[in-house]
Amino acid sequence: MKFFISLITTSLLFFSGSLLAGSHAKTIMLSTKGPGAGNPFWASVEAGAKDAAEELGVNLIILSPPQESDVMAQVAQIEDQIAKGVDGIAIAPTDPNAVAPILDDAMAS
């Protein structure tokens, strides 16, 4: 679990280093596989991400589907945040094949 939290923190550091070049605070979306409140693992991931975002001055949006198996909800959340113009996305995909095309399009734009 500490490895995954470190990975999220490192991702936030990477994104903040490349994104904070502008004058306004950047927004990063963290999409987890399932609800953090009911799962100690994801609750720890969320807590670590919030701490890192606060330390780095990054706006953090944490979203997860209502159920870990709800692929379409995660896809809709990602598409919504991309449409809103988030500056970065850190994701634990529910189904990597379902989100890959969306993320490829986001990186290309």
Where are the model-predicted features located?
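Short intrinsically disordered, low-complexity coil segments enriched in acidic
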Residues: M1-K2, S109
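N-terminal signal peptide c-region/cleavage motif recognized by signal peptidases
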Residues: S16-S18
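A residue-level marker of the well-folded mature domains of exported/periplasmic proteins
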Residues: L20-S109
